[in-house]
Amino acid sequence: MPLAEQLRGLRSGDFSIGFAHTAEVGDDILTEPLWHDSLVVAVPARHPLLSHKAVPLHQLASYPLVLCDPQVYEGYYRELARLLRPLERQPDVAEHVSSLDMMLTLVGAGYGVGFIRASRIAATLRPDVVIRPLAMDSAVITTYLLRPVSEDLPVSAERFIARLREHSGD
């Protein structure tokens, strides 16, 4: 569900909690970081970037990117934009995609390089795509728990949040 829809639902009381990859959600929504995941790059097999064991960020400026759809994955896209901000020029975006499968298909076909959370590597095992880490420690995406500031949560939601907190370090 897009971030904007989640925020509308949280503000209207339709939702008690939500999840996002950005903490930029407004003052009326509380954010709590739950877990962190490294970002890695998906590179076509036989690509010049494969000469690096860890891909330097500035090297990505020379190649087209396959990025997530900014409306469907708004929070994730914001964090990717923040990560790419140090590049000296606007990245060349070959395509925006609405699924991991489509991104991997386009990367495997040589259309560009994509980004994946490290926890999703197992879902990306394909002969035409190679995964490489980024050569930077700050290439991390955080998943946040969202909840309205003024809302008393149902007991079931409180229990669910307690379980998330227990397992957030795993």
Q: Model-found features: residue ranges?
A:
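Short beta-strand-centered segments that line the small-molecule binding cleft or hinge
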Residues: 2-43, 56, 79, 103, ...
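Short secondary-structure boundary segments
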Residues: 22-23, 45, 117-120, 143
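Short loop->beta-strand "edge-of-pocket" segments that line small-molecule binding or catalytic clefts
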Residues: 39, 48, 55-75, 168
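Residues embedded in well-ordered beta-strands
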Residues: 40-42, 48, 66, 113, ...
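A late-sequence structural motif
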Residues: 129-170
